Amino acid sequence: RKGIMLTLKTKGKINPLAIHEVEKFAAELLKQIPDSISCLIALHNNTNNDFSVRTYLPGGPRQNDASQVYADEWQDIDDIALTTDQDIYSKMASFGYNSILQDNVNVFRDGSLSVYYGEQNRRYINIETQHGKTVQYREMLKKLLSILDDEKKMVASQAATDMEQTTSLR
């Protein structure tokens, strides 16, 4: 509720009915997300120069919301990967994507899903591109899915190794 109030206040309009409806929507949305998922992926788009990696750089309006920011000079500033997870941040940045690691402690509590997931210490990533840039969208999403798939394989491989070691000790 606090995040909803703060967001509506920044927009200049606080309406009790709107607050109630947003709370209902948020509760229903959270019910739809299984607890078992390892990472929630959100897909957003923005308009040219309205919301970008610069928003999170020192001097930007959301500079306190990020603990780390990687801005690639060859990428469009509007195309970003924002995450609550250090590993995902590092990997997306290593592939040259504008990347933002949300500061889960100091982030502005705006009621967004990234803030909620950060508070829960859960993995969340938002792939966001300028409206209409579907090729970039797909490329970033494909790379993210590859990263997550590699992690899954590594966990499975480690589990198999652990099982072999346990069996050989008997």
Map each language-model feature to its residues.
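Structured catalytic-domain cores with a bias toward divalent-metal coordination
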Residues: 1-169
